[in-house]
């Protein structure tokens, strides 16, 4: 086990994101309950969760839209931090522990 010098944002699509996704692509079968969280590693020490989310919201949203195969031309216009907080459930923390002996690649 090794402590990693990073914090994290765990991001899971909310039901609003899944509803939008299904309106974009009717073949989508996933539900909000089945959606898996993605963990993004960030700076280890931070004091203001809102500032951290504001800093990384665009990168995370872009990554998530791409992860679900959404064409950039169809992304919501004027997507801001308020939309982000409604479309994604986020947990932040500052402790990451690698349980494996193999190096991270």
Give each language-model segment a name:
Residues 42-104:
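Amphipathic protein-protein interaction modules
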Residues 1-44:
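Extended, charge-biased low-complexity segments
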């Amino acid at each position: 086990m090794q402590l990693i010098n990073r914090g994290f944002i765990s991001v899971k699509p909310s039901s609003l994101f899944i509803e939008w996704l299904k309106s974009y692509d009717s073949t989508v079968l996933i539900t909000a309950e089945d959606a898996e969280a993605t963990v993004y590693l960030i700076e280890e020490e931070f004091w203001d969760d809102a500032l951290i989310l504001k800093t990384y919201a665009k990168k995370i949203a872009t990554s998530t839209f791409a992860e679900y195969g959404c064409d950039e031309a169809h992304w919501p216009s004027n997507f801001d931090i308020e939309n982000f907080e409604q479309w994604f459930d986020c947990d932040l923390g500052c402790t990451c522990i690698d349980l494996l002996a193999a190096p991270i690649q």
